[in-house]
Amino acid sequence: MGDELLDKTYVHLVVDDNTANLLRETLLVLGRNEEVIAVSDALAMGPLTDVDEGARSRFEWWARLGVQDLQELENYVDDRAIWDALRTDPRDVMLWSSAHPDEHLFALRACWHLRDYPTRIHEVVMTNKLYPRVSDAFARLGIMGPKAGVAHWSDRSRIVDVKERANRWEAIRSREGDWLRELRDGQIVHLGVDAHDEKLVMACSKDWTDSIRAVGGVIAELPVGLSLLTWRIHTLVRDGVLEARGPTNRLGMPSELKAKGVTA
């Protein structure tokens, strides 16, 4: 960290409201009274081609996955007002990200939106340095909390490759279709929306299995969202790959699942 960063005042950007609240706690510990803004959409899945132009395809994507509050959904995906305000705000911007694909993509996108103001953009990249047993994909502030945020504050730096990151975002955004996106060796890899179906089926391949346990095993291993897995389970049941029984649980899934053909 260069000395020129010591006395700056920032507006802080994060992914999702939970992380925003934890960052506010972090800043209080650091003695900093600064604004925190959450940019909420989970960019690691779904279409991206119009995400910076109203995000109608993302609205349709989340509706397909079962989001029912359409007004809240529209506010969730269309964040143009946030970026418009940041471009006219004289303060420097601090991005908080990690190796989680949602946060990696968020940081690339922020560089694209603020590409005309490259000297204003800084970052804190969370790692597992405080908790080495946690994989970097899960070493995000929203999981590890304020203690880790405080420990990483001294690692903050100005982003020097804003143009390159903006170009990478444009390339990723231009790829049409519904995709899952993973971060491998620092690069975004595109996968089909059914990429984790086999893991879900394997989790139910021996007997009737609690559906929450089935999705929990995948979430514990991979940085993938619950809403996607819930949608995939309904698709697999509809297509006859999984059998279901019992009432709908609190996550909107059948209580129990079993792979087709398994004798319980």
Give the location of each predicted region:
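A structured, charge-rich N-terminal accessory region that forms the first stable segment of a protein
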Residues: 1-74
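Short helix-coil junctions and helix-kink-helix linkers
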Residues: 213-226
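Long, hydrophobic/aromatic-enriched structural stretches that serve as scaffold segments
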Residues: 65-108
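A conserved mid-domain beta-alpha-beta active-site/ligand-binding segment of alpha/beta enzyme cores
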Residues: 137-209, 213
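Short, cationic-aromatic polyanion-contact patches
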Residues: 247-264
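A short alpha->loop->secondary-structure connector
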Residues: 31-33, 109-121
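A short, conserved structural fragment
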Residues: 237-248
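Short amphipathic alpha-helical interaction segments
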Residues: 223-238
